[in-house]
Amino acid sequence: MSSSKNTLLIGTRKGLVIYEKRSAGWEYAAEHFDGIPVSYAVSSPDNKIWWACQDHGHWGCKLHLSKDRGANWEEIEAPKYAEEDEIKDGVPASLKYLWVLQPHLNGNAEHVLVGTEPGGLFESKNAGKNFELVRGLWEHPSRKEQWFGGGRDYAGIHSIVIDKDNHDHRYVGISCAGVFETWDGGRQWEPKNKGLRADFLPDPASEVGQDPHLLVAHPVNQKVMWQQNHCGIYRSVDGANQWEDISEPNGVANFGFVITLDENDENTAWVVPAVSDEKRLAIDRALVVCRTRDGGKSWEKLTNGLPQEACYDIVYRHSMDITGDTLAFGTTTGNLYLSENQGDEWMALNHNLPMIYSVRFS
């Protein structure tokens, strides 16, 4: 199946890299913000706005947008916590990291939601001129005592799912807290973690404290949701009311960070496994993508064109995307791969990029 999305936005440790599909194939086209870590980059659904989240280290987080496909960029004031906001009692809240920026689905290209560390969800309806902290989630009674960092100091919102038919219905994925759902635009939230397992907690079935690495919903039937979790791969067919562990009991499809869904088939998904939490590297030093076509009942390895020895690559949670039959993913060691037949065959677009944080088609 062909697609009209012929641009790749690649957020890396040293800038935003652009690839474009031209008559000769996919080619390197441009770079922006050279030398500056771009934690996430994405376009609005209508491609009118490109967004780039940056992590300047000592200088903090910054946010830029472009309304002309990168020809010009405008810096937008990043979301801010109020002086009275606290991560925990006595610990002032301040912006630590921009995890994800999710354009809204309501046709307003300027309407976005931003997930941050230390656990705040922000919303802007005017292209970042004003950001408002979603107080209902920030003030959830579980946050101060039961949310905590997963690989970073504090909890982070890395996944935002908006219901295409009811825009007040939303989900977020939080490391570490779990999946939360709202039906009223963010005023009230409920944890939706039944069936998940957190092996690192005293109570692995705890309602709050789960660690989804990435939460996604099928674009057509959004009741079908998937997550690559710290403790396996999970799927729900009832809008996150109940999760089922679909990891391979004796196979490689288990630990990892990213999960990507077929746009038309709610039973097809791809993951890129790693060894484990303790050993974050390619299994048997061979890069493998796993695909299921039956909702996780079985998984197949896809390795044609991928390195099968002396490979240490892993793929971060936002570093794989799909459009039509075309998949692309980037790795922690700067390798960029693309398949135009749903992963049956892979080609390398680049072996020399910086560490890749995000890959998105536009």
Label every model-predicted segment.
Residues 1-362:
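Extracellular glycan-interacting surfaces
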